Curated annotation (Swiss-Prot):
It is found in: Cytoplasm. Together with its co-chaperonin GroES, plays an essential role in assisting protein folding. The GroEL-GroES system forms a nano-cage that allows encapsulation of the non-native substrate proteins and provides a physical environment optimized to promote and accelerate protein folding. This is Chaperonin GroEL. One of its GO terms (biological process) is protein refolding. ATP binds at T29, L30, G31, P32, D86, G87, T88, T89, T90, G413, D498. One of its GO terms (molecular function) is isomerase activity. Transmembrane segments: none annotated. It comes from Herpetosiphon aurantiacus (strain ATCC 23779 / DSM 785 / 114-95).
Amino acid sequence: MAKQVAFNEEARRALKRGVDVVADAVKTTLGPRGRNVAIDKKFGSPTVTHDGVTVAKEIELKDPFENMGARLLVEAATKTNDVAGDGTTTATVLAQAIVHEGLRQVAAGANSMMIKRGLDKGTAVLLQAIRDLAKPVNDRTDISSVATISAADSSIGDLIAEVMDKVGKDGVITVEEGKGLGYETEYTEGMQFDRGYISAYFVTNSDRMESDLEDPYILITDKKISSIQEILPVLEKVLQFTKNFVIIAEDIDGEALPTLVLNKLRGTINVLAIKAPGFGDRRKAMLQDIAILTGGTVISEEIGRKLDSATVEDLGRARRVIANKDETTVIEGRGDEDAIKARIEQIRAQIETTTSDFDREKLQERLAKLAGGVAVLKVGAATEPELKERKHRVEDALSTARAAVEEGIVPGGGIALLSVLPALDSVVPANQDEKAAVLILRRALEEPIRQLARNAGEDGAVIIDTVRRLQKEKGDSTLGYNVITGEYGSMVEMGIIDPAKVTRSALQNAVSIASMILTTDALVADIPEKEAAPAPGGMGGMGGMDF
Protein backbone atom coordinates (compact mmCIF):
# COMPACT_ATOMS: atom_id res chain seq x y z
CA MET A 1 0.00 0.00 0.00
CA ALA A 2 1.23 3.50 -0.88
CA LYS A 3 2.33 5.72 2.02
CA GLN A 4 2.16 9.43 2.70
CA VAL A 5 5.00 11.18 4.51
CA ALA A 6 5.11 14.49 6.38
CA PHE A 7 8.30 16.24 7.58
CA ASN A 8 9.49 18.75 10.18
CA GLU A 9 7.08 21.60 10.96
CA GLU A 10 4.24 20.07 8.95
CA ALA A 11 4.59 16.77 10.87
CA ARG A 12 4.69 18.43 14.29
CA ARG A 13 1.73 20.70 13.50
CA ALA A 14 -0.34 17.63 12.50
CA LEU A 15 0.55 15.91 15.78
CA LYS A 16 -0.36 19.09 17.67
CA ARG A 17 -3.81 19.21 16.02
CA GLY A 18 -4.44 15.62 17.14
CA VAL A 19 -3.23 16.40 20.66
CA ASP A 20 -5.54 19.43 20.84
CA VAL A 21 -8.65 17.47 19.79
CA VAL A 22 -8.15 14.90 22.58
CA ALA A 23 -7.01 17.41 25.21
CA ASP A 24 -9.84 19.86 24.53
CA ALA A 25 -12.41 17.07 24.96
CA VAL A 26 -10.76 15.60 28.06
CA LYS A 27 -9.84 18.75 30.01
CA THR A 28 -13.47 19.85 30.34
CA THR A 29 -13.85 16.98 32.87
CA LEU A 30 -11.10 18.26 35.21
CA GLY A 31 -12.04 18.97 38.82
CA PRO A 32 -15.27 19.13 40.82
CA ARG A 33 -16.72 21.69 38.41
CA GLY A 34 -15.76 19.59 35.37
CA ARG A 35 -18.43 18.79 32.78
CA ASN A 36 -19.67 15.41 31.60
CA VAL A 37 -18.94 13.99 28.14
CA ALA A 38 -21.50 11.83 26.31
CA ILE A 39 -20.05 9.02 24.18
CA ASP A 40 -22.16 7.39 21.48
CA LYS A 41 -22.23 3.59 21.45
CA LYS A 42 -23.16 1.44 18.46
CA PHE A 43 -25.41 -0.61 20.70
CA GLY A 44 -27.46 0.59 23.65
CA SER A 45 -27.65 4.00 25.25
CA PRO A 46 -24.77 6.53 25.18
CA THR A 47 -22.20 6.49 27.99
CA VAL A 48 -22.11 9.70 30.03
CA THR A 49 -18.81 10.02 31.87
CA HIS A 50 -16.68 12.35 33.98
CA ASP A 51 -13.60 10.15 33.49
CA GLY A 52 -10.79 11.55 31.33
CA VAL A 53 -9.25 8.27 30.17
CA THR A 54 -12.64 6.88 29.08
CA VAL A 55 -13.17 9.95 26.87
CA ALA A 56 -9.62 9.81 25.48
CA LYS A 57 -9.83 6.13 24.51
CA GLU A 58 -12.97 6.72 22.45
CA ILE A 59 -11.45 9.37 20.17
CA GLU A 60 -10.33 8.23 16.71
CA LEU A 61 -9.52 10.87 14.06
CA LYS A 62 -9.95 10.63 10.28
CA ASP A 63 -6.61 12.23 9.35
CA PRO A 64 -3.89 9.59 9.99
CA PHE A 65 -1.23 12.14 11.02
CA GLU A 66 -3.55 13.91 13.45
CA ASN A 67 -4.65 10.51 14.76
CA MET A 68 -1.02 9.72 15.63
CA GLY A 69 -0.93 12.80 17.87
CA ALA A 70 -4.23 11.79 19.45
CA ARG A 71 -3.02 8.22 20.11
CA LEU A 72 0.21 9.46 21.69
CA LEU A 73 -1.74 11.64 24.11
CA VAL A 74 -4.11 8.75 24.89
CA GLU A 75 -0.98 6.73 25.73
CA ALA A 76 0.03 9.32 28.36
CA ALA A 77 -3.45 9.19 29.91
CA THR A 78 -3.65 5.38 29.80
CA LYS A 79 -0.19 4.88 31.30
CA THR A 80 -1.03 7.25 34.16
CA ASN A 81 -4.29 5.39 34.74
CA ASP A 82 -2.51 2.00 34.73
CA VAL A 83 0.15 3.10 37.20
CA ALA A 84 -1.83 5.34 39.56
CA GLY A 85 -5.50 4.71 38.72
CA ASP A 86 -6.27 8.42 38.28
CA GLY A 87 -4.68 11.68 37.13
CA THR A 88 -5.42 11.05 33.46
CA THR A 89 -6.93 14.48 32.87
CA THR A 90 -4.02 16.18 34.64
CA ALA A 91 -1.55 14.24 32.46
CA THR A 92 -3.48 15.32 29.34
CA VAL A 93 -3.54 19.00 30.37
CA LEU A 94 0.19 18.98 31.20
CA ALA A 95 1.15 17.23 27.95
CA GLN A 96 -0.86 19.69 25.85
CA ALA A 97 0.76 22.66 27.61
CA ILE A 98 4.30 21.26 27.12
CA VAL A 99 3.60 20.50 23.44
CA HIS A 100 2.25 24.03 22.83
CA GLU A 101 5.14 25.81 24.55
CA GLY A 102 7.73 23.40 23.15
CA LEU A 103 6.58 23.74 19.54
CA ARG A 104 6.71 27.51 19.90
CA GLN A 105 10.38 27.26 20.93
CA VAL A 106 11.23 24.76 18.16
CA ALA A 107 9.53 26.98 15.55
CA ALA A 108 11.66 29.89 16.81
CA GLY A 109 14.82 27.89 16.06
CA ALA A 110 15.49 25.94 19.28
CA ASN A 111 17.05 22.47 18.99
CA SER A 112 14.38 19.91 19.92
CA MET A 113 16.93 17.45 21.39
CA MET A 114 18.29 20.18 23.68
CA ILE A 115 14.71 21.01 24.70
CA LYS A 116 14.15 17.32 25.53
CA ARG A 117 17.35 17.21 27.58
CA GLY A 118 16.26 20.30 29.52
CA LEU A 119 12.79 18.81 30.11
CA ASP A 120 14.37 15.60 31.45
CA LYS A 121 16.63 17.55 33.84
CA GLY A 122 13.76 19.67 35.12
CA THR A 123 11.39 16.70 35.48
CA ALA A 124 13.89 14.70 37.57
CA VAL A 125 14.11 17.62 40.04
CA LEU A 126 10.32 18.09 40.12
CA LEU A 127 9.61 14.38 40.74
CA GLN A 128 11.95 14.40 43.73
CA ALA A 129 10.27 17.59 45.02
CA ILE A 130 6.84 15.89 44.80
CA ARG A 131 8.17 12.91 46.80
CA ASP A 132 9.60 15.30 49.42
CA LEU A 133 6.29 17.20 49.60
CA ALA A 134 4.25 14.01 50.20
CA LYS A 135 2.88 13.25 53.68
CA PRO A 136 2.05 9.66 54.66
CA VAL A 137 -1.63 8.71 54.97
CA ASN A 138 -2.26 8.33 58.68
CA ASP A 139 -5.97 7.84 59.07
CA ARG A 140 -9.31 7.01 57.53
CA THR A 141 -10.16 10.71 57.05
CA ASP A 142 -7.30 11.17 54.56
CA ILE A 143 -8.42 8.14 52.52
CA SER A 144 -12.00 9.42 52.55
CA SER A 145 -10.88 12.88 51.35
CA VAL A 146 -8.77 11.46 48.50
CA ALA A 147 -11.55 9.12 47.32
CA THR A 148 -14.19 11.87 47.63
CA ILE A 149 -12.20 14.20 45.37
CA SER A 150 -11.70 11.48 42.76
CA ALA A 151 -15.37 10.44 42.72
CA ALA A 152 -16.78 13.95 43.35
CA ASP A 153 -19.09 12.26 45.88
CA SER A 154 -18.53 12.16 49.66
CA SER A 155 -20.68 9.02 50.10
CA ILE A 156 -18.31 7.09 47.79
CA GLY A 157 -15.29 8.48 49.66
CA ASP A 158 -16.67 7.43 53.06
CA LEU A 159 -17.61 3.98 51.75
CA ILE A 160 -14.14 3.28 50.32
CA ALA A 161 -12.47 4.51 53.53
CA GLU A 162 -14.68 2.15 55.55
CA VAL A 163 -13.97 -0.84 53.28
CA MET A 164 -10.19 -0.21 53.23
CA ASP A 165 -10.25 0.14 57.00
CA LYS A 166 -11.83 -3.32 57.33
CA VAL A 167 -9.79 -5.32 54.81
CA GLY A 168 -6.48 -3.50 55.30
CA LYS A 169 -4.23 -1.82 52.72
CA ASP A 170 -3.33 -5.16 51.11
CA GLY A 171 -6.91 -6.42 51.02
CA VAL A 172 -8.63 -7.16 47.72
CA ILE A 173 -11.56 -4.85 46.94
CA THR A 174 -13.52 -5.64 43.80
CA VAL A 175 -16.24 -3.48 42.27
CA GLU A 176 -19.31 -5.17 40.76
CA GLU A 177 -22.68 -4.09 39.41
CA GLY A 178 -25.36 -4.53 42.06
CA LYS A 179 -29.08 -5.17 41.82
CA GLY A 180 -30.25 -2.31 44.08
CA LEU A 181 -30.19 1.47 43.76
CA GLY A 182 -27.41 2.22 46.24
CA TYR A 183 -24.15 0.69 47.44
CA GLU A 184 -23.70 -2.69 49.16
CA THR A 185 -20.60 -4.31 50.64
CA GLU A 186 -19.75 -7.96 51.23
CA TYR A 187 -16.76 -9.09 53.29
CA THR A 188 -14.92 -12.40 53.42
CA GLU A 189 -12.86 -13.12 56.51
CA GLY A 190 -9.83 -15.39 56.29
CA MET A 191 -8.44 -17.07 53.18
CA GLN A 192 -11.00 -18.03 50.57
CA PHE A 193 -10.39 -20.07 47.41
CA ASP A 194 -12.70 -21.21 44.64
CA ARG A 195 -12.87 -24.95 45.33
CA GLY A 196 -15.53 -26.60 47.45
CA TYR A 197 -16.08 -30.07 48.93
CA ILE A 198 -15.57 -33.08 46.65
CA SER A 199 -18.77 -34.80 47.80
CA ALA A 200 -22.03 -33.49 49.29
CA TYR A 201 -21.76 -36.32 51.86
CA PHE A 202 -19.21 -34.15 53.71
CA VAL A 203 -21.91 -31.53 54.52
CA THR A 204 -22.44 -30.82 58.24
CA ASN A 205 -25.18 -28.18 57.84
CA SER A 206 -27.85 -29.50 55.45
CA ASP A 207 -29.89 -26.24 55.57
CA ARG A 208 -27.01 -24.19 54.17
CA MET A 209 -25.38 -27.15 52.37
CA GLU A 210 -22.08 -26.34 54.08
CA SER A 211 -19.39 -28.28 55.86
CA ASP A 212 -18.24 -26.38 58.95
CA LEU A 213 -15.37 -27.80 61.02
CA GLU A 214 -14.07 -26.21 64.24
CA ASP A 215 -10.35 -26.37 65.04
CA PRO A 216 -9.50 -29.06 62.47
CA TYR A 217 -6.16 -30.58 61.49
CA ILE A 218 -5.42 -29.95 57.79
CA LEU A 219 -3.53 -32.27 55.43
CA ILE A 220 -2.18 -30.39 52.37
CA THR A 221 -0.84 -32.28 49.34
CA ASP A 222 -0.44 -31.80 45.59
CA LYS A 223 -1.01 -35.53 44.99
CA LYS A 224 -4.12 -37.43 43.94
CA ILE A 225 -5.31 -39.76 46.72
CA SER A 226 -6.70 -43.04 45.36
CA SER A 227 -6.02 -45.46 48.21
CA ILE A 228 -7.02 -45.01 51.85
CA GLN A 229 -3.81 -46.82 52.83
CA GLU A 230 -1.81 -43.73 51.78
CA ILE A 231 -3.38 -41.54 54.48
CA LEU A 232 -4.28 -44.20 57.05
CA PRO A 233 -1.12 -43.66 59.21
CA VAL A 234 -1.79 -39.92 59.64
CA LEU A 235 -5.56 -40.50 60.09
CA GLU A 236 -4.94 -42.84 63.02
CA LYS A 237 -2.61 -40.29 64.64
CA VAL A 238 -5.12 -37.42 64.20
CA LEU A 239 -7.94 -39.45 65.80
CA GLN A 240 -5.93 -39.45 69.04
CA PHE A 241 -6.47 -35.63 69.21
CA THR A 242 -9.67 -34.80 67.31
CA LYS A 243 -12.27 -36.10 64.88
CA ASN A 244 -12.14 -32.93 62.75
CA PHE A 245 -9.90 -33.50 59.74
CA VAL A 246 -9.57 -31.55 56.45
CA ILE A 247 -7.84 -32.91 53.35
CA ILE A 248 -6.77 -30.53 50.56
CA ALA A 249 -5.49 -32.62 47.63
CA GLU A 250 -5.33 -32.57 43.81
CA ASP A 251 -8.22 -35.07 43.86
CA ILE A 252 -9.62 -37.94 45.88
CA ASP A 253 -11.00 -40.89 43.96
CA GLY A 254 -10.82 -44.69 43.80
CA GLU A 255 -11.65 -46.44 47.05
CA ALA A 256 -10.33 -43.54 49.18
CA LEU A 257 -13.42 -41.34 48.62
CA PRO A 258 -16.16 -43.91 49.51
CA THR A 259 -14.10 -45.04 52.54
CA LEU A 260 -13.89 -41.47 53.88
CA VAL A 261 -17.62 -40.89 53.20
CA LEU A 262 -18.56 -44.12 54.98
CA ASN A 263 -16.49 -43.25 58.06
CA LYS A 264 -17.99 -39.74 58.06
CA LEU A 265 -21.55 -41.15 58.00
CA ARG A 266 -20.73 -43.61 60.78
CA GLY A 267 -19.35 -40.77 62.92
CA THR A 268 -15.88 -42.30 63.14
CA ILE A 269 -14.27 -39.12 61.80
CA ASN A 270 -15.66 -35.70 60.85
CA VAL A 271 -13.75 -35.36 57.58
CA LEU A 272 -13.88 -32.77 54.78
CA ALA A 273 -12.14 -33.41 51.44
CA ILE A 274 -11.44 -30.44 49.14
CA LYS A 275 -9.82 -30.19 45.71
CA ALA A 276 -6.69 -28.02 45.60
CA PRO A 277 -7.24 -24.55 44.05
CA GLY A 278 -5.63 -23.30 40.83
CA PHE A 279 -3.65 -25.13 38.17
CA GLY A 280 0.01 -25.91 37.47
CA ASP A 281 2.57 -23.64 39.13
CA ARG A 282 -0.17 -21.40 40.55
CA ARG A 283 -1.64 -24.43 42.37
CA LYS A 284 1.73 -25.20 43.96
CA ALA A 285 2.09 -21.57 45.07
CA MET A 286 -1.45 -21.45 46.53
CA LEU A 287 -0.96 -24.73 48.41
CA GLN A 288 2.24 -23.28 49.86
CA ASP A 289 0.28 -20.15 50.89
CA ILE A 290 -2.31 -22.32 52.68
CA ALA A 291 0.47 -24.32 54.37
CA ILE A 292 2.22 -21.17 55.63
CA LEU A 293 -1.08 -19.64 56.81
CA THR A 294 -2.02 -22.78 58.76
CA GLY A 295 1.47 -23.79 59.91
CA GLY A 296 1.50 -27.00 57.89
CA THR A 297 3.72 -28.58 55.23
CA VAL A 298 2.80 -29.40 51.63
CA ILE A 299 3.32 -33.16 51.20
CA SER A 300 4.81 -33.40 47.73
CA GLU A 301 6.99 -35.91 45.91
CA GLU A 302 8.93 -32.92 44.53
CA ILE A 303 10.52 -32.58 47.99
CA GLY A 304 10.79 -36.36 48.44
CA ARG A 305 7.74 -36.81 50.68
CA LYS A 306 5.07 -39.49 50.29
CA LEU A 307 1.65 -39.35 51.90
CA ASP A 308 2.30 -42.33 54.18
CA SER A 309 5.27 -40.39 55.67
CA ALA A 310 3.03 -37.52 56.89
CA THR A 311 2.99 -36.86 60.64
CA VAL A 312 0.80 -34.69 62.88
CA GLU A 313 3.58 -32.04 62.79
CA ASP A 314 3.08 -31.75 59.01
CA LEU A 315 -0.60 -30.87 59.40
CA GLY A 316 -1.91 -27.31 59.39
CA ARG A 317 -4.32 -25.89 61.96
CA ALA A 318 -7.09 -23.27 61.80
CA ARG A 319 -9.84 -22.04 64.10
CA ARG A 320 -12.45 -22.93 61.51
CA VAL A 321 -12.81 -24.26 57.94
CA ILE A 322 -16.08 -23.71 56.04
CA ALA A 323 -16.78 -25.19 52.59
CA ASN A 324 -19.74 -25.28 50.21
CA LYS A 325 -19.85 -26.83 46.75
CA ASP A 326 -18.06 -23.83 45.15
CA GLU A 327 -15.64 -22.33 47.67
CA THR A 328 -13.73 -22.89 50.90
CA THR A 329 -12.78 -20.40 53.62
CA VAL A 330 -9.96 -20.98 56.12
CA ILE A 331 -10.45 -18.72 59.15
CA GLU A 332 -7.63 -17.78 61.57
CA GLY A 333 -4.86 -20.07 60.39
CA ARG A 334 -2.42 -21.00 63.16
CA GLY A 335 0.72 -20.38 61.11
CA ASP A 336 3.87 -18.65 62.36
CA GLU A 337 3.52 -14.84 62.11
CA ASP A 338 7.11 -14.34 60.90
CA ALA A 339 6.70 -16.99 58.18
CA ILE A 340 3.46 -15.34 57.00
CA LYS A 341 5.15 -11.90 56.91
CA ALA A 342 8.08 -13.33 54.92
CA ARG A 343 5.67 -14.90 52.43
CA ILE A 344 3.80 -11.60 52.09
CA GLU A 345 7.07 -9.75 51.32
CA GLN A 346 7.99 -12.42 48.78
CA ILE A 347 4.66 -11.97 46.94
CA ARG A 348 5.03 -8.16 47.08
CA ALA A 349 8.44 -8.47 45.42
CA GLN A 350 6.92 -10.67 42.68
CA ILE A 351 4.18 -8.06 42.09
CA GLU A 352 6.86 -5.39 41.58
CA THR A 353 8.83 -7.44 39.03
CA THR A 354 6.06 -9.10 36.98
CA THR A 355 5.27 -7.67 33.54
CA SER A 356 1.98 -9.54 33.06
CA ASP A 357 -1.24 -7.80 34.16
CA PHE A 358 -2.92 -11.20 34.65
CA ASP A 359 -0.09 -12.49 36.86
CA ARG A 360 -0.09 -9.23 38.83
CA GLU A 361 -3.83 -9.54 39.48
CA LYS A 362 -3.46 -13.15 40.68
CA LEU A 363 -0.50 -12.24 42.89
CA GLN A 364 -2.49 -9.38 44.45
CA GLU A 365 -5.33 -11.81 45.18
CA ARG A 366 -2.90 -14.17 46.90
CA LEU A 367 -1.40 -11.26 48.86
CA ALA A 368 -4.84 -10.15 50.04
CA LYS A 369 -5.78 -13.64 51.15
CA LEU A 370 -2.65 -13.85 53.27
CA ALA A 371 -2.41 -10.27 54.52
CA GLY A 372 -5.83 -8.73 54.64
CA GLY A 373 -9.27 -9.71 53.52
CA VAL A 374 -11.56 -9.64 50.54
CA ALA A 375 -14.40 -7.15 50.02
CA VAL A 376 -16.90 -6.79 47.18
CA LEU A 377 -18.38 -3.34 46.56
CA LYS A 378 -21.69 -3.58 44.71
CA VAL A 379 -22.79 -0.44 42.87
CA GLY A 380 -26.45 0.13 42.01
CA ALA A 381 -28.35 2.84 40.11
CA ALA A 382 -31.75 3.55 38.58
CA THR A 383 -30.63 3.42 34.92
CA GLU A 384 -27.85 1.63 33.04
CA PRO A 385 -25.97 4.79 31.91
CA GLU A 386 -25.99 6.05 35.51
CA LEU A 387 -24.82 2.63 36.74
CA LYS A 388 -21.85 2.56 34.34
CA GLU A 389 -20.86 6.13 35.18
CA ARG A 390 -21.15 5.50 38.93
CA LYS A 391 -19.13 2.26 38.69
CA HIS A 392 -16.39 4.13 36.78
CA ARG A 393 -16.21 6.73 39.55
CA VAL A 394 -16.03 4.10 42.30
CA GLU A 395 -13.22 2.24 40.48
CA ASP A 396 -11.28 5.51 40.00
CA ALA A 397 -11.77 6.52 43.63
CA LEU A 398 -10.59 3.10 44.82
CA SER A 399 -7.43 3.27 42.68
CA THR A 400 -6.75 6.80 43.95
CA ALA A 401 -7.14 5.74 47.58
CA ARG A 402 -4.70 2.85 47.06
CA ALA A 403 -2.20 5.22 45.43
CA ALA A 404 -2.49 7.57 48.44
CA VAL A 405 -1.72 4.75 50.88
CA GLU A 406 1.26 3.72 48.75
CA GLU A 407 3.18 7.00 48.31
CA GLY A 408 1.39 9.51 50.54
CA ILE A 409 -0.62 12.65 49.81
CA VAL A 410 0.08 16.17 48.53
CA PRO A 411 -2.12 19.31 48.44
CA GLY A 412 -4.77 18.99 45.71
CA GLY A 413 -6.37 21.47 43.34
CA GLY A 414 -3.17 21.88 41.28
CA ILE A 415 -1.33 23.36 44.28
CA ALA A 416 1.23 20.53 44.55
CA LEU A 417 2.54 21.33 41.06
CA LEU A 418 2.62 25.04 41.90
CA SER A 419 4.44 24.33 45.19
CA VAL A 420 7.28 22.36 43.57
CA LEU A 421 8.06 25.07 40.97
CA PRO A 422 10.85 26.66 43.13
CA ALA A 423 12.73 23.33 42.82
CA LEU A 424 13.45 24.27 39.19
CA ASP A 425 15.77 27.03 40.47
CA SER A 426 18.34 24.30 41.22
CA VAL A 427 18.51 23.16 37.56
CA VAL A 428 21.70 24.30 35.83
CA PRO A 429 20.98 24.55 32.07
CA ALA A 430 23.91 23.83 29.74
CA ASN A 431 22.67 26.22 27.05
CA GLN A 432 19.84 28.56 26.07
CA ASP A 433 17.64 25.73 24.73
CA GLU A 434 17.81 23.85 28.04
CA LYS A 435 16.98 27.12 29.79
CA ALA A 436 13.93 27.44 27.50
CA ALA A 437 12.88 23.89 28.49
CA VAL A 438 12.85 24.88 32.17
CA LEU A 439 10.62 27.86 31.29
CA ILE A 440 8.30 25.47 29.39
CA LEU A 441 7.91 23.39 32.57
CA ARG A 442 7.26 26.51 34.68
CA ARG A 443 4.42 27.53 32.35
CA ALA A 444 3.00 23.99 31.96
CA LEU A 445 2.81 23.31 35.70
CA GLU A 446 0.44 26.27 36.09
CA GLU A 447 -1.96 24.86 33.49
CA PRO A 448 -3.91 22.38 35.72
CA ILE A 449 -4.90 25.14 38.17
CA ARG A 450 -5.81 27.43 35.23
CA GLN A 451 -8.05 24.70 33.78
CA LEU A 452 -9.69 24.00 37.16
CA ALA A 453 -10.51 27.71 37.42
CA ARG A 454 -11.72 27.83 33.80
CA ASN A 455 -14.11 24.91 34.41
CA ALA A 456 -15.46 26.76 37.45
CA GLY A 457 -15.97 29.96 35.42
CA GLU A 458 -13.08 31.82 37.08
CA ASP A 459 -9.99 33.60 35.73
CA GLY A 460 -7.00 31.26 36.17
CA ALA A 461 -4.36 34.02 36.01
CA VAL A 462 -6.02 35.98 38.84
CA ILE A 463 -6.30 32.86 41.03
CA ILE A 464 -2.63 31.89 40.47
CA ASP A 465 -1.47 35.43 41.36
CA THR A 466 -3.64 35.49 44.50
CA VAL A 467 -2.46 32.02 45.60
CA ARG A 468 1.19 32.98 45.13
CA ARG A 469 0.73 36.21 47.09
CA LEU A 470 -1.03 34.41 49.98
CA GLN A 471 1.60 31.64 50.06
CA LYS A 472 4.36 34.26 50.24
CA GLU A 473 2.59 36.35 52.92
CA LYS A 474 1.76 33.39 55.18
CA GLY A 475 4.73 31.15 54.33
CA ASP A 476 2.43 28.19 53.68
CA SER A 477 2.86 26.27 50.41
CA THR A 478 -0.41 24.32 50.95
CA LEU A 479 -2.58 27.43 50.47
CA GLY A 480 -4.82 27.29 47.41
CA TYR A 481 -8.25 27.99 45.96
CA ASN A 482 -11.34 25.87 46.60
CA VAL A 483 -13.36 26.03 43.35
CA ILE A 484 -16.48 24.65 45.09
CA THR A 485 -16.74 27.26 47.87
CA GLY A 486 -14.80 30.04 46.12
CA GLU A 487 -12.53 30.44 49.18
CA TYR A 488 -8.76 30.54 49.66
CA GLY A 489 -7.18 28.44 52.41
CA SER A 490 -5.06 25.41 53.28
CA MET A 491 -5.92 22.65 50.81
CA VAL A 492 -4.98 19.95 53.32
CA GLU A 493 -7.23 21.43 56.04
CA MET A 494 -10.10 21.72 53.53
CA GLY A 495 -9.64 18.03 52.66
CA ILE A 496 -8.52 18.81 49.09
CA ILE A 497 -5.65 16.35 48.66
CA ASP A 498 -4.22 14.19 45.88
CA PRO A 499 -2.10 11.04 46.04
CA ALA A 500 1.56 11.88 45.37
CA LYS A 501 1.72 8.87 43.05
CA VAL A 502 -1.03 10.32 40.83
CA THR A 503 0.64 13.75 40.58
CA ARG A 504 4.06 12.19 39.96
CA SER A 505 2.81 9.76 37.29
CA ALA A 506 0.81 12.47 35.51
CA LEU A 507 3.89 14.72 35.23
CA GLN A 508 6.24 11.89 34.26
CA ASN A 509 4.02 10.53 31.47
CA ALA A 510 3.06 13.99 30.17
CA VAL A 511 6.73 14.99 29.77
CA SER A 512 7.58 11.63 28.17
CA ILE A 513 4.89 11.88 25.47
CA ALA A 514 5.41 15.63 24.88
CA SER A 515 9.17 15.07 24.42
CA MET A 516 8.43 12.37 21.87
CA ILE A 517 6.20 14.73 19.88
CA LEU A 518 8.73 17.61 20.02
CA THR A 519 11.54 15.40 18.71
CA THR A 520 9.51 13.89 15.85
CA ASP A 521 10.69 15.06 12.40
CA ALA A 522 8.81 12.70 10.09
CA LEU A 523 5.48 10.88 9.99
CA VAL A 524 4.62 7.91 7.76
CA ALA A 525 1.05 6.67 7.28
CA ASP A 526 -1.07 4.76 4.77
CA ILE A 527 -2.85 6.86 2.16
CA PRO A 528 -6.56 6.43 2.99
CA GLU A 529 -8.33 4.52 0.22
CA LYS A 530 -11.38 6.13 -1.29
CA GLU A 531 -14.44 3.95 -0.91
CA ALA A 532 -15.56 2.53 -4.26
CA ALA A 533 -18.86 3.91 -5.55
CA PRO A 534 -21.70 1.40 -5.12
CA ALA A 535 -22.48 -0.63 -8.27
CA PRO A 536 -25.71 0.31 -10.08
CA GLY A 537 -28.69 -1.94 -9.39
CA GLY A 538 -29.52 -4.71 -11.89
CA MET A 539 -32.54 -4.58 -14.20
CA GLY A 540 -35.78 -5.76 -12.70
CA GLY A 541 -37.07 -9.14 -13.89
CA MET A 542 -40.12 -9.37 -16.14
CA GLY A 543 -43.06 -10.98 -14.41
CA GLY A 544 -44.76 -14.06 -15.84
CA MET A 545 -41.73 -15.36 -17.82
CA ASP A 546 -40.11 -18.68 -16.92
CA PHE A 547 -36.71 -19.81 -18.23
